[in-house]
């Protein structure tokens, strides 16, 4: 099973066509950020303007996710192992895909952020955690790291508003404490991250995707790191 969307048939006619750098050779761009930070919006923007193959989070394919949000302690380990195995498959697929690819949330986030948060809150038992982390560490040794990581960050009130507006049933009862814990882990992880260059974007205002001047400035920031 593949978790990518179809390649866009046409590019945005209003965007400056001089930016062809992203298609000159194969690149792997990763988009990271908390729940509701705007990852899918950014991935869609990149795919509309460039011939980039997107790879998305396999949320809908996870048979444990709905149960996980209802009872995290019972279903955390099952859900995280599912994500880990499917993210590994996605990494294999994107490495075999010709041209530049962009991924909505990486396997690193699954382990370093989400699984870690669950273990620290005692929703994953120590024995299960040790098994999970050994599997993750083994997988990481065979992965191609991103050429660029785009880290999206915005205030907690903005995250909660976006989560409410998009109305996903399984997300409606996410505790605020859980979101705050994820954000702390994200910030700590970014400080330790060394696989590639990182561009941090504040997404509280999405003008950088709707205003032409801001869009060009945004792409120039990314271009400098590729």
Model-based region annotation:
Residues 31:
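Hydrophobic anchor at the beta1->P-loop junction of P-loop NTPases
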Residues 48-86:
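Conserved substrate/cofactor phosphate-moiety recognition/catalytic segment
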Residues 75-144:
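Glycine-rich phosphate-binding loop used to anchor ATP phosphates in small-molecule kinases
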Residues 39:
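Conserved lysine of the Walker
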Residues 34:
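P-loop (Walker A) phosphate-binding loop of NTP-binding proteins
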Residues 113-185:
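A glycine- and Lys/Arg-enriched "phosphate-lid" helix/loop adjacent to the NTP-binding pocket
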Residues 160-226:
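NTP-dependent small-molecule kinase module
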